[in-house]
């Protein structure tokens, strides 16, 4: 694959994909897709992939049960943006987990309590690999692959119950 340098805009009739190449094996891994429409996640547990989900808005439904969304192994530059798409406050939780205990979240989210209090909720930065968004009324949470171990997380959650970071 050749390298190209562009001095003007790049146009695509469909999407643009960013990839990473393993320096040892030469294997190509798709990191993110730019330009595709949003992905409506199913009402159930979902294992995400970079090829299908990274770089796109992920619409989280008003679940009929607590749903767990499992991220793929972190790749620097991968981006997962979760947006609550329910039409009313949800009576269940959205849980977003990394693929394992060695992949954890750094930073946190702003919590907008529906009783008018505003605060921030932070991961511990060294082992929290799960965020539980409790009975949301709204949320917009972005998770970015920081490197091959960690995810950076930020965004906002509106609910009567604070979101919670935890170890898996």
Regions found by a protein language model. Name each.
Residues 9-11, 15-117, 145-168:
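Exposed extracellular interaction/assembly regions and N-terminal maturation sites
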Residues 118-139:
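Structured beta-strand segments within beta-sheet-rich domains
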Residues 2-3, 11:
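Long, leucine- and charge-enriched amphipathic alpha-helices
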Residues 140-144:
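Short tryptophan-centered beta-strand motifs in secreted/extracellular beta-sheet-rich domains
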Residues 1, 67-70, 131:
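Short aromatic-glycine motifs in intrinsically disordered, low-complexity regions
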